[in-house]
Amino acid sequence: MTETKNPLIDSSIGSIARSLVADDHIWTEFLKLQISDHTKRTYASALNDFFVQMTGVKVNPHQIREFLNLPSAQAIAVVLSYRSRLLALNLSPNTINTRLAAIKSLVNHARKLSQCGFSLADVASLKVEAYRDTSGVEPNVYRVMIEAIDTETVGGKRDYAIMRLLWDNALRRSEVTALNIEDFQSDKLWIIRKGKIQKQAIDLAGKTRLALAQWLGVRGGAASQPLFIALDNRAYGKRLSGRSLGYLVERLAQDADVEKRMSPHRVRHSSITAYLDLSDGNVRDARLLSGHAKLETLVIYDDRRKNVQGQVSSKLADLV
């Protein structure tokens, strides 16, 4: 017996299928990929930069469709031209590679939907020298920085809590700014590590717990709201951005007359190096602190901490 097709069902399925490959759907679904919220924000910003630089217009479904419909040679030429522009701006290899990764991710997603006929696999990323500078500041210098914070003020309580997390737990900038109030639970903090989606718990020292509790005592807010917020008039109450966190660390370092230019990442380097000094080079424990995926990264820290290369060069120099 031949089944009679239901035109209503066919029409509905066809409508759904067409909507799934619509211009705006590609962009919407791309932002729902199983990547961390931080990566989503980073990719969205990177793609916007790509379209603004190459077309003068912010990212939108129409621009995405035009790009995805380009012949392969033209699409690759556009992306290579964009990479050249980024190099001319003297951006770091990591920054350039992140922006290229965002474009490649969008193209790969569109290819899965059969909405793109080219690949960007031949667009090479820039070679990055891993952890060229792992130097930081000594613990006594960092102590001067945080002791100068006026913890009697609302801003001071926030800044002190942030600075304790950066040092005591060697957190990355993105790990701090992504925190919500509900992520702080008694003696633990739930964070999203770099490249991960699921949160994991880390233990907090007593000083860190106290600093967070004192900040929350004046911050208030619902559990789902950002743990650290902007306090200036223009952005009050919004999640503290990574850029603002960088300015905060830099300002505190300048106030304390620290000679080195400080950043959240340099604080992280300082913390990891200080623990390696304290533990006589226990790279396995340092890995638990830092959340580095590869143990080899901590070996680089330890070798440079001990100036292994300098010692080797001195021994060779003594031979001739």
Where is each model-derived feature located?
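Conserved catalytic core of the tyrosine transesterase superfamily
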Residues: M1-V320
